[in-house]
C-alpha cells in the first residue's frame, strides 16, 4: 500500500484572530479544541502523517499556539473502524508566547457524547462534524480551498463531494430506476418516492412529509406565521422564496427565457414546465400503475 502524503497542522486547523478568540466563551473554546482533535483523529485513522511544523511557525509569529499533549502516531495502520472507536485522543491546549516555554503536559480528551447547544442558533448538535459546520457558519470562515476552481469551503471533508461537481461524478445510484446522485443523502431522499415513506409527521394534523424542512414549512400554516413581508404592498409569506417570486411581479421581471420558443417566465417552475413540453420528458410516475406525467400536478 502506498504511503499517504504528510499533512501539516495547518491543513486541519481553523484559525481565529485574537479578537475573535476573545469573543468566544469557555464552552465554545473547549468545543473548538474537541472538534479539532476529532478532525486530526480522522486523518490519523486514514493513515496520514501529521507534521508539527505549523506549531513552530505560530510560535515565531506570536500568534495563537496549540500545544500537543502527546506525540502524533507516525505509522498508523489505516484501520478506520478501530481507530474511530478510541475514546482517548491527542490533547491540545491554547497557550501564548508568554508561557510557551512551560513543560508540555499530557491530558486525555474524550470524544463528545452529549449534545452541544449552539448559542447563536439555539439548535442541538451531537456529531462533531455538525458542530464544526455550525461554528464555521456563524464565524463566516471558509479555511479550505478547492484546487480546481479556488472556491473556499468550510469543511475539511467537503472537498471530496465538491470535487465531484467538477468531474460530474455521481457515485450513488438508485437500484430501482438507475437515477444517480452525488451524495447518499439525496439518494435516500429520492428512494422515498419509490417506497412512499414519509418519516416527518405533523403532530397537529397528522400530515406526513419526506423532508424535515417541508414539515417545518407546513407547521407555519397552523400557527399563521408569515415572517417574510413585501415592503411594497405589505403582503406576507411563509417562505422567503415565495416573497422573492412575489417581488418580481412588482418589477415585471421575467428572468427565465426558453431558448427554443423564446417564451419568458418570471418563475423557474413555469420555465421548467415549458421545457418538459419541448423534451417530452415525463419524470412523474405513478407507483401503482406506472403511468408517467410531465407535471407533478397531473400525477396528483
UniProtKB/Swiss-Prot annotation:
Pfam family, one: KRAB
Gene Ontology biological-process annotations: regulation of transcription by RNA polymerase II
Annotated localization: Nucleus
Keyword terms: DNA-binding, Metal-binding, Nucleus, Repeat, Transcription, Transcription regulation, Zinc, Zinc-finger
One Gene Ontology term, aspect cellular component: nucleus
Major location category of this protein: nucleus
Limits of the KRAB domain: 7-78
InterPro entries listed in its UniProt record: KRAB, KRAB_dom_sf, Znf_C2H2_sf, Znf_C2H2_type
First and last residues of each zinc finger (C2H2-type): 172-194, 200-222, 228-250
GO MF annotation list: DNA-binding transcription factor activity, RNA polymerase II-specific; RNA polymerase II transcription regulatory region sequence-specific DNA binding; zinc ion binding
CDD domains tied to this protein: KRAB_A-box
PROSITE patterns: KRAB (PS50805), ZINC_FINGER_C2H2_1 (PS00028), ZINC_FINGER_C2H2_2 (PS50157)
Family, per entry: Belongs to the krueppel C2H2-type zinc-finger protein family.
Functional summary from the UniProt entry: May be involved in transcriptional regulation.
Full protein name: Zinc finger protein 705A
Organism field: Homo sapiens (Human)
Amino acid at each position: 500500500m502506498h504511503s499517504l502524503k504528510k499533512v501539516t497542522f495547518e491543513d486541519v486547523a481553523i484559525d481565529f484572530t485574537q479578537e475573535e478568540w476573545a469573543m468566544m466563551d469557555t464552552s465554545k473554546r473547549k468545543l473548538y479544541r474537541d472538534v479539532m482533535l476529532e478532525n486530526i483523529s480522522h486523518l490519523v485513522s486514514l493513515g496520514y502523517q501529521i507534521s508539527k511544523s505549523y506549531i513552530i511557525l505560530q510560535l515565531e509569529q506570536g500568534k495563537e499556539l496549540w500545544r500537543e499533549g502527546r506525540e502524533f502516531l507516525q505509522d498508523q495502520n489505516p484501520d478506520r473502524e478501530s481507530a474511530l472507536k478510541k475514546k482517548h485522543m491527542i490533547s491540545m491546549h491554547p497557550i501564548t508566547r508568554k508561557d510557551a516555554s512551560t513543560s508540555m503536559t499530557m491530558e486525555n480528551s474524550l470524544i463528545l457524547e452529549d449534545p452541544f447547544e449552539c448559542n447563536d442558533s439555539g439548535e442541538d448538535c451531537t456529531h462533531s462534524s455538525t458542530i464544526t459546520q455550525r461554528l464555521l457558519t456563524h464565524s463566516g470562515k471558509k479555511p479550505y480551498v478547492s484546487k480546481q476552481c479556488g472556491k473556499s469551503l468550510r469543511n475539511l471533508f467537503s472537498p471530496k463531494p465538491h470535487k465531484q461537481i467538477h468531474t460530474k461524478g455521481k457515485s450513488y445510484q438508485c437500484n430501482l430506476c438507475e437515477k444517480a446522485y452525488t451524495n447518499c443523502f439525496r439518494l435516500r431522499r429520492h428512494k422515498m418516492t419509490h417506497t412512499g415513506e414519509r418519516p416527518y409527521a405533523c403532530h397537529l394534523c397528522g400530515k406526513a412529509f419526506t423532508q424535515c424542512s417541508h414539515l417545518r414549512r407546513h407547521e407555519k400554516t397552523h400557527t399563521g406565521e408569515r415572517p417574510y413581508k413585501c415592503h411594497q404592498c405589505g403582503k406576507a409569506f411563509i417562505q422567503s422564496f415565495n416573497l422573492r417570486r412575489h417581488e418580481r411581479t412588482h418589477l415585471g421581471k421575467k428572468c427565465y427565457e426558453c431558448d427554443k420558443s423564446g417564451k419568458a417566465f418570471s418563475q423557474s417552475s413555469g420555465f421548467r414546465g415549458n421545457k418538459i413540453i419541448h423534451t417530452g420528458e415525463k419524470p412523474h410516475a405513478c407507483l401503482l400503475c406506472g403511468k408517467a406525467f410531465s407535471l407533478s400536478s397531473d400525477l396528483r
